[in-house]
Amino acid sequence: MGNSKSGALSKEILEELQLNTKFTEEELCSWYQSFLKECPSGRITKQEFQSIYSKFFPEADPKAYAQHVFRSFDANSDGTLDFKEYVIALHMTSAGKTNQKLEWAFSLYDVDGNGAISKSEVLEIVMAIFKMISPEDVKQLPEDENTPEKRAEKIWGFFGKKDDDKLTEEEFIEGTLANKEILRLIQFEPRKVKEKLKEKKP
């Protein structure tokens, strides 16, 4: 990011972000100012990202989930995100287009980055999601998905996989597009994330 340390967001990045997200110019500029206050270097570390994410969910423990979100957007694995990657991360976890979102969801669940998802990786992400759900909301969940183990079992069952099978990106996206129930189960309710983003700018 050429002008990451200056006070204004470059026109190119602003236009690209408006094109790829639903955020307004005003929102993006005000977020950029906040971003520079929190991260004067123009880059955000995993710890800083977790800390900002925690502000959105004061009643929950989003650290594990935030860590996985961070990993999935740190394309060059350098341990930092720039403002563009940061905004796209917030957008994808709250609003992104279905296909884009599913590609991202695959990378979120592919914890070891080997291009396939195992049942244990599904459980790891679902456990992180459960830490984001309040105990009251957990009580409202159906009996067959009210623990991380049950929910992971249900997701894996929808794909018709054996315990030691792997799931490719194509299978993951096709299966999820074909079954709205899987889509609901694999994500932390984006509506809630969206509400939080509107309530509290980073």
UniProtKB/Swiss-Prot annotation:
Biological processes per GO annotation: phototransduction; regulation of calcium ion transport; regulation of signal transduction; visual perception
Annotated stretches, region: Interaction with GRK1: 189-192
Alphabetical list of SUPFAM superfamilies matching this protein: EF-hand
Residue positions of covalent lipid attachment, annotated as N-myristoyl glycine: G2
GO cellular component, one term: photoreceptor outer segment
Residues the UniProt record annotates as site (Interaction with GRK1): K192
Compartments, as annotated in UniProt: Photoreceptor inner segment; Cell projection, Cilium, Photoreceptor outer segment; Photoreceptor outer segment membrane; Perikaryon
PTM remark: The N-terminal glycine is linked to one of four different types of acyl groups. The most abundant is myristoleate (14:1), but 14:0, 14:2, and 12:0 acyl residues are also present. The Ca(2+) induced exposure of the myristoyl group, known as the calcium-myristoyl switch, promotes RCVRN binding to the photoreceptor cell membranes only when intracellular Ca(2+) concentration is high.
Alphabetic keyword roster: Calcium, Cell projection, Disulfide bond, Lipoprotein, Membrane, Metal-binding, Myristate, Oxidation, Redox-active center, Repeat, Sensory transduction, Vision
Membrane topology label: Lipid-anchor
Residue ranges of domain EF-hand in the record: 41-59, 61-96, 97-132, 147-182
GO molecular function: calcium ion binding
Modified residues annotated as Cysteine sulfenic acid (-SOH) in this record: C39
InterPro entries attached to this UniProt entry: EF-hand-dom_pair (IPR011992), EF_Hand_1_Ca_BS (IPR018247), EF_hand_dom (IPR002048), Recoverin (IPR028846)
Binding site for Ca(2+) 1: D74, N76, D78, T80, E85
Keyword flag Repeat: yes
Annotated Ca(2+) 2 binding sites: D110, D112, N114, E121
Principal cellular location given in the protein's record: other
Entry similarity comment: Belongs to the recoverin family.
Domain topic, free-text comment: EF-hand 2 and EF-hand 3 domains are the low-affinity and the high-affinity calcium binding sites, respectively. EF-hand 1 and EF-hand 4 domains do not bind calcium due to substitutions that disrupt their respective Ca(2+) binding loops. The cooperative binding of calcium to the EF-hand 2 domain following EF-hand 3 domain calcium binding requires myristoylation. Calcium binding to the 2 EF-hand domains induces exposure of the myristoyl group through a protein conformation change, this process known as the calcium-myristoyl switch facilitates binding to photoreceptor cell membranes.
Biological role stated in the UniProt entry: Acts as a calcium sensor and regulates phototransduction of cone and rod photoreceptor cells. Modulates light sensitivity of cone photoreceptor in dark and dim conditions. In response to high Ca(2+) levels induced by low light levels, prolongs RHO/rhodopsin activation in rod photoreceptor cells by binding to and inhibiting GRK1-mediated phosphorylation of RHO/rhodopsin. Plays a role in scotopic vision/enhances vision in dim light by enhancing signal transfer between rod photoreceptors and rod bipolar cells.
Subunit structure: Homodimer; disulfide-linked. Homodimerization is caused by prolonged intense illumination. May form a complex composed of RHO, GRK1 and RCVRN in a Ca(2+)-dependent manner; RCVRN prevents the interaction between GRK1 and RHO. Interacts (via C-terminus) with GRK1 (via N-terminus); the interaction is Ca(2+)-dependent.
Protein name: Recoverin
Organism lineage: Eukaryota, Metazoa, Chordata, Craniata, Vertebrata
